[in-house]
Amino acid sequence: MTTFKLVISDPKSGIAKQIEISGANAEKLIGKKIGDQIPVKELGLDLKALFGKDFPEDVKMEIRGGTDKDGFPMRPDIHGPRRVRILLSKGPGFRPKEKGERRKKTVRGNTISPEIVQVNVKLVY
């Protein structure tokens, strides 16, 4: 049985809430990629109870990233659910200390798999 920590951010209010989903709702996320949008109704979440305000009926969640079981971040430019070691100069998974610095870092692909533990999403309405 798959379990995900789902970090839901509301960009209009600047509030983020973390919940845990498992079972059939978590299985619906497997195979989705960064940038995909999922209707909130599909996961059966009650946003009013979480955020304390009403949302439109057609509100969706856009996947923005996540981390795997060992803490490696997902990158939108690496395709598939694989873990790779790539040379990075900027972006998710690397913060350069000097101008022009590049390093090899391990990152996760852009597809959600059972090895992913945390999924970051933002509300789109």
From Swiss-Prot:
This is Small ribosomal subunit protein eS6. Transmembrane segments: none annotated. One of its GO terms (molecular function) is structural constituent of ribosome. NCBIfam families: PRK04290.1-2 (NF003293), PRK04290.1-3 (NF003294). PROSITE patterns: RIBOSOMAL_S6E. Belongs to the eukaryotic ribosomal protein eS6 family. It comes from the Archaea. One of its GO terms (cellular component) is ribonucleoprotein complex. It comes from Pyrococcus horikoshii (strain ATCC 700860 / DSM 12428 / JCM 9974 / NBRC 100139 / OT-3). It holds the Pfam family Ribosomal_S6e. SMART domains: Ribosomal_S6e (SM01405). Keywords: Ribonucleoprotein, Ribosomal protein. InterPro entries: Ribosomal_eS6 (IPR001377), Ribosomal_eS6_arc (IPR020924), Ribosomal_eS6_CS (IPR018282). One of its GO terms (biological process) is translation.
